[in-house]
Amino acid sequence: PFTYAGTIEAYKLTSAMVTTEEYAQQNKYAHSLFVADYAVTHTISWGGLNDEGLIFGKNYASGGVDYTLRAPSVGSNYTGSGNSERGVPQSNEWDTMLNKDSGYIQNWNEMYSWGQDTVSVDASLRAIRGYTSARYWSSTTATNSYPDVGFRPVLEVLNSDTLGSGGL
């Protein structure tokens, strides 16, 4: 199942890159997201997910609604610690959803979730979130696959403006 996070103002990526503040500000936009309640699979590398088109987006349709199924943006680095920890840039989708409602991202305990972002200090690393708290940011290499690192997709609603008031 997925939780509807509503409309958020955040950036997403379309290819592997380090996300700069400038890029995030120029590319953030309002979009409606659902976020998976769990990691739908684990023990799969970022590279393996990317090979299947699942990091930056795959078209998906259900109930007459068109979506892009993909990983969320999570930040290329982090700032703060504990409950004040955030991915940087802070206009990433993961933190933007949590800023709206801390309950939107569930079942993070002892499970990391892959994000889209390349880590700013090492291009071989990819950002992951979760495990010790919903806000926790960490990283691992794009080729690693571990049982505690999973794929928690988001569904981006593509035609929300044509759905009408009862569409979602």
Model regions and ranges:
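Surface-exposed charge patches in extracellular/virion surface proteins
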Residues: I8-K12, K28, K58, K100, ...
